[in-house]
Amino acid sequence: MSDTPLRIAVTGVTGRMGKEIVTCIVKEEKQFSQEIVLGAAITRLNTNICGMDAGILINTDALGIEITDNLESIKDNFDVLVDFTAPDISIEYLKFCVNNNKNIVIGTTGFNQIHKNIILNASHKIGIVFSSNFSIGVALISKLLHKITQVIGNTSDISIIETHHNRKRDIPSGTSLTMQNIIVNALRSIHSNRIIDSNLDSTTYSPASSYKDILIHSIRAGDVVGEHTVLFAGPGERLEITHKASDRLIFAHGALRAAFWVGRDKIGLFDISDILEMDTLL
């Protein structure tokens, strides 16, 4: 391991997650043994704050790092880029990282299949941690879902209920789609009844396969950070698995843990389960 702290570039610093990640790096560096530091603060939508010290943005002392919208000007100032923005913008940042041999953590959701193919191709050249949710709790639930579905999936009606704040753009949430795909793959392995869902890519899921109907119910209300419940309803009983996020700090911690894990040298496509080494669980 290098003795030099890992320098993190954060995009979308005026957004909810961008600001949270900057705050986490600066104010909670002890959690990471001071092995990561803020290297760059990037914006695209709020160019009027370019030149402002990033410390002012999070109400702390000046950090000596100016917010910028010019990637070329800061390409030598960071090792890993952490991105929670929007799909098209994320792809631009990804291409920049590929061209400059920088690893990237992507927490953006709402990607289409073309975007996902670009991410996959880029992972042959750089290290990418790509996850719809960087909460450890959600990662554990995702691991449990596969096992539970294998046991009771073919005798249950399965639904996913997700609730987020009223400014969240993508419906359904990326996390709920990830959960749905985990359940679908588990059902495929036990040859269950047919699944009908317009969100699923017909090129990925064969019409000849048989699945159960899995519905996603989305709620957008107030300032809810994020809640996900998976319901397995069977004869005489039901099982509900719920995760409730009350603070975006958990996502910031997870993303920075991912950045530290992928570091400067790893190449490939990874997700939160790789970082937590969850293949050894259950």
From Swiss-Prot:
Belongs to the DapB family. It is found in: Cytoplasm. Its EC number is 1.17.1.8. NADP(+) binds at R44. Catalyzes the conversion of 4-hydroxy-tetrahydrodipicolinate (HTPA) to tetrahydrodipicolinate. Coiled coil: none annotated. Keywords: Amino-acid biosynthesis, Cytoplasm, Diaminopimelate biosynthesis, Lysine biosynthesis, NAD, NADP, Oxidoreductase. InterPro entries: DapB_C, DapB_N, DHDPR_bac, NAD(P)-bd_dom_sf. It comes from Blochmanniella pennsylvanica (strain BPEN). The gene is dapB. PANTHER family: 4-HYDROXY-TETRAHYDRODIPICOLINATE REDUCTASE 1, CHLOROPLASTIC-RELATED, DIHYDRODIPICOLINATE REDUCTASE. GO terms for molecular function: 4-hydroxy-tetrahydrodipicolinate reductase; NAD binding; NADP binding; oxidoreductase activity, acting on CH or CH2 groups, NAD or NADP as acceptor. Gene3D superfamilies: Dihydrodipicolinate Reductase, domain 2, NAD(P)-binding Rossmann-like Domain. (S)-2,3,4,5-tetrahydrodipicolinate binds at H165, G174, T175. This is 4-hydroxy-tetrahydrodipicolinate reductase.
